[in-house]
Amino acid sequence: MRKKLMQIAKTAGNFFSARSLSKIDQKEGHANFVTNIDREVEEYLQQALLSLVPGSQVIGEEKENGALTDAPTWIVDPVDGTTNLIHDYRCSAVSIALCENRKPVLGLIWQPYMQEMFYAEAGRGASLNGKEIHVSETPFDKALVAFGTAPYHTELAEKSMELALAYLHSCADVRRSGSAAIDLAYLACGRHDAFFELNLKPWDYAAGSLIVQEAGGVVTMPLEPGEMQYDRSAAILASSAVIADEIAAVFARYAGNRQ
């Protein structure tokens, strides 16, 4: 199934450049866009993934059809980084997770512009283009922290920037890519050392969280009690294991803590 799934993701990524942006709509929330490419890719993925695992269901960003159950469920973001796509920023990805018993057992992120395939299966490690990857061991004061601004939720903008500034004062620097999936993938392979965003949907973090965990990293919902859940919007905090406590301490100081 792995090879077939990777081919499905690559075909979906071809839509990014092979199709023209003929329609851009505004969804609910500030700067929340959907294009004809988002819809075309999701339609393709739904058909391909349901054929790959008969009896499964698909939860996608554009349709949000179905709810997460114990049954095999694909959680899909057809274009993570739609605003980047609109501006030809070339930092967008296809994100696919397969959940069983409400937990990801497989995660894939395909960045077509860089031809990079991030992949993980629960208990079997993570890879980039077939080579095993691990999170970094960079110390806290030299860490690079990626973040998202939760742009669809303007009420979180000030808190997001305040938190980013706090990390900037504590670590080496901060980065903003515009794609949570890519940020999590880059964390998994050591390109940066931590990531936060104050509001993400399951299709933003389901695949990436598994890839980070299988690469030896830590992923939490710092404002939620208990373990990671994949059926809700939530703040996401992720990092390498060696700086997890320090990253969490800054987050708690500036953005709150578990309920």
Which residues fall in each region the model found?
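Acidic, metal-binding active-site segment of PIN/NYN-like and related structure-specific nucleases
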Residues: 57-63, 216-231
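Acidic beta-strand-loop-alpha-helix segment within the catalytic core
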Residues: 97-184, 226, 232-259
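Active-site-adjacent structural elements in enzyme catalytic cores
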Residues: 51, 59, 68-134, 210-213
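A short, glycine/Asx- and small/polar-enriched loop/turn
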Residues: 68-72, 140, 188-191, 230-233
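Alpha-to-beta junction loops
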Residues: 189-194, 217-218
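Residue-level signal for inorganic ion chemistry
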Residues: 16, 38, 49, 82, ...
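Acidic, metal-associated active-site segment
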Residues: 183-189, 206-214
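N-terminal subdomain of lithium-sensitive/metallo-dependent phosphomonoesterases centered on the IMPase/IPPase/PAP
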Residues: 1-79, 256-259
